[in-house]
Amino acid sequence: MHKLHFWLVAFFMVVHCTSIMADDYVQNNDIPYQENGNEYAKERCKLDFYYPTHVKEFPVVVWFHGGGLEGGGKFIPQELKDKGIGVIGVNYRLLPKAGIQECIDDAAAAVAWAFRNVTRYGGSTSKIFVAGHSAGGYLTDMIVLKKDYLQKYGIDADSIAGAFPFSGQVITHFNVRKARGLSSLTPMVDDTAPLYYVRKLPMPFVLLSGDRELELYGRYEEQAYFWRMMQLHQNDQCLLYEMDGYDHGNMPEAGHKIMVRHIKTICDGKKIKR
């Protein structure tokens, strides 16, 4: 009888603790971040914000989904949950209903929303990180490297605490090239390519790629050249990771762990290392 009583008490303690842990995080969905725009902008320009209620001045990751700039939707990566980090999952307008500049502008507007609003939820504007996978990595590159996009919203891109593009295109995006009648295997670098805007950055910039033999056509090699150009601009806090055995689709599983580790290091005021 005493054993039964003990296990009943233990069971209810576990249930109670699980409930407390669930209450430590809140997720607010479908928050509009663009003040103006047509019906399509009003439909797409929304974000979800997952954040801890038990951490003061928590870091925030603004996360852009992939999908070739023509598909996909906002979500909070499971690997980033329960880490003491706020995560903003962003929807943005897509090709062909929108143009490439509108896609990038939406990404900038979402980051500007973070700078203006995270303190209301307990987050810190000095710990805002930008990241995304594939098309989301491309958007990350563009708004960090070309300062004009965030300047439009009164935000200095150099205020971003760190950037983590996951397998982002750094030459002209393949769907932009496709719209111009070029094949996906015809490389091009113009003013819509992150490579065009390589510069010295004040924040850590971590490039993540899948296995070079499993990635999309030449994607690792793009990252490697991008990394070399960043090094030539004295970006000693620009690191490149290749996820052995991971393809383009599943490489975030490994990449998220690296990102969380580096975010902790940056928030501790230390330099990141491989």
Label for each model-derived stretch:
Residues 20-55:
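N-terminal cap/lid segment of alpha/beta-hydrolase-fold proteins
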Residues 57-66:
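Short beta-strand element of the alpha/beta-hydrolase
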Residues 98-119, 142:
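Alpha/beta-hydrolase active-site loop
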Residues 115-179, 190:
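Primarily recognizes the serine-hydrolase "nucleophile elbow" in alpha/beta-hydrolase
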Residues 154-162, 167-176, 184-224, 228, ...:
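The feature captures the conserved acid-bearing segment of alpha/beta-hydrolase catalytic domains
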Residues 208, 224, 231-274:
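C-terminal catalytic histidine-bearing segment of alpha/beta-hydrolase fold enzymes
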